[in-house]
């Protein structure tokens, strides 16, 4: 798992320093705060202390990166939790990697999309930019669930569609190889 997380950071860092898919982010000041928000992938389950993607991203970017990952979380829970995390940390940027547990549990993807949309709207209303990271469906080819592209287009987000899919298909990033 730690190789997967390290690969995630290596692929995320250039994005945070520039642009993606013709959308740009405001530069993050040295004192700026990045909120890595999501489930077990964000929390770093399976990685040693200091090896979660938020920890490695903080080291590489020299920015404050808050690890707001909650193992086992579904988007309905994340929607509520974000309203508590944002006033506590005042992030400039949110890396939103959420919905994998919804997919694994076969929850209604329309509801997942609604919860993610509410999180994005809340973040924007409170002055934070959002980078949306796509989560693969449960299928042989690990294609990203279409709701992520729809949300990215609707909210004009920087979107990383295939990051997890690409990492999951690459044996180099698997800790159990």
Describe the predicted segments one by one.
Residues 1-9:
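Bacterial N-terminal signal peptides that target proteins for export
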Residues 21-74, 79-90:
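Serine-esterase "nucleophile elbow" of acetyl-processing enzymes
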Residues 21, 28, 59-60, 80-177:
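Alpha-helical cap/lid subdomain in secreted, periplasmic
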